Amino acid sequence: MELHILEHRVRVLSLARPGLWLYTHPLIKLLFLPRRSRCKFFSLTETPEDYTLMVDEEGFKELPPSEFLQVAEATWLVLNVSSPSGAAVQAAGVTKIARSVIAPLAEHHVSVLMLSTYQTDFILVREQDLSVVIHTLAREFDIYREVGGEPVPVARDDSSNGFPRAQHGPSPTVHPIQSPQNRFCVLTLDPETLPAIATTLIDVLFYSHSPPREAASGGPGSSSIAFFAFSLIEGYISIVMDAETQKKFPSDLLLTSSSGELWRMVRIGGQPLGFDECGIVAQIAGPLAAADISAYYISTFNFDHALVPEDGIGSVIEVLQRRQDGLGS
């Protein structure tokens, strides 16, 4: 398999809900006029707490500082795994890279963020951790770094000088999980037809807000939550929304898989997770991979979110609760 280090240098930001009005103009520019901003990596995720933005340096320039905008200190690099065209199709999403990427990075104390889209899965690592990432994954992958749009092979360094060996160390923190009742769709859209849904998208993102709801907090079967994710990355659009919100959009423009599968969410974290802890994604992706369950995974500024097939949510909760009980004992 190949691991590509993409050219994007990404910043991760939290926009407080009361400050949304201040950023509507730059967000509309990033959403609908990417040629004007030259932004190639843009992701906006609405959660009950805030809006998480993942943007490259060009996109970051569009967002003026304010009391409403919180910026994570690190600059993040974007990794992407490509499988050979003839590879057997197994569970999709983060599950297929759980053993080969997520687990080894957790063992080497590398914190990761995940952004699954309709098209692929992006793994974000801090720029300062890149040498450890390359050293950790070089045995498993042919690694390429994009330079000027072209993949350049990264020399494999067989020496282990200066690199810590994988450690099991203290047990990871056991983070609570909840499963809101929403049923979600993972969709894409031909960028040429984006103007046709622009007014609906603006309405949903900026004007369709009920009063802020508490995050799902009633145990594994919590009520519905606000969640909407839009990404425009290298010209490809991906949208995650609940089935009720989808009804507002023209059905002939939004594309989904032929099965039209619906997904349920597992939300990870009782308190904001921060960016320093390692192994959070592995804590979820590992058990799902062992059970061969497909999952999309979206990290946000405060919490993580896994989307699993609707008909398997019961077994997913059981698998994860069993894992948590094992870690907590």
Swiss-Prot record:
Keyword Phosphoprotein: yes
GO biological process terms, semicolon-separated: cellular response to L-arginine; negative regulation of TORC1 signaling
Domain comment as written in the entry: Based on x-ray crystallography data, the protein would be constituted of 4 tandem ACT domains instead of the 2 predicted from the sequence.
Job description of the protein: Functions as an intracellular arginine sensor within the amino acid-sensing branch of the TORC1 signaling pathway. As a homodimer or a heterodimer with CASTOR2, binds and inhibits the GATOR subcomplex GATOR2 and thereby mTORC1. Binding of arginine to CASTOR1 allosterically disrupts the interaction of CASTOR1-containing dimers with GATOR2 which can in turn activate mTORC1 and the TORC1 signaling pathway.
Organism per entry: Bos taurus (Bovine)
PTM: Phosphorylation at Ser-14 by AKT1, promoting the interaction between CASTOR1 and RNF167.
Keyword field: Cytoplasm, Phosphoprotein, Ubl conjugation
Listed name of the protein: Cytosolic arginine sensor for mTORC1 subunit 1
Family: Belongs to the GATS family.
Example GO molecular function: protein sequestering activity
Keyword Ubl conjugation: yes
Limits of the ACT domain: 72-138, 260-321
InterPro entries reported in the protein's UniProt record: ACT-like_dom_sf (IPR045865), CASTOR1_ACT-like (IPR049479), CASTOR1_N (IPR040778), CASTOR_ACT_dom (IPR027795), CASTOR_fam (IPR026249), CASTOR_mTORC1 (IPR051719)
Record note on quaternary structure: Forms homodimers and heterodimers with CASTOR2. Interacts with the GATOR2 complex which is composed of MIOS, SEC13, SEH1L, WDR24 and WDR59; the interaction is negatively regulated by arginine. Interacts with TM4SF5; the interaction is positively regulated by leucine and is negatively regulated by arginine.
Gene giving rise to this polypeptide: CASTOR1
Domain of life where this protein originates: Eukaryota
Single GO cellular component term: cytosol
Residues given in the record as L-arginine binding sites: S111, V112, G274, I280, V281, T300, F301, N302, F303, D304
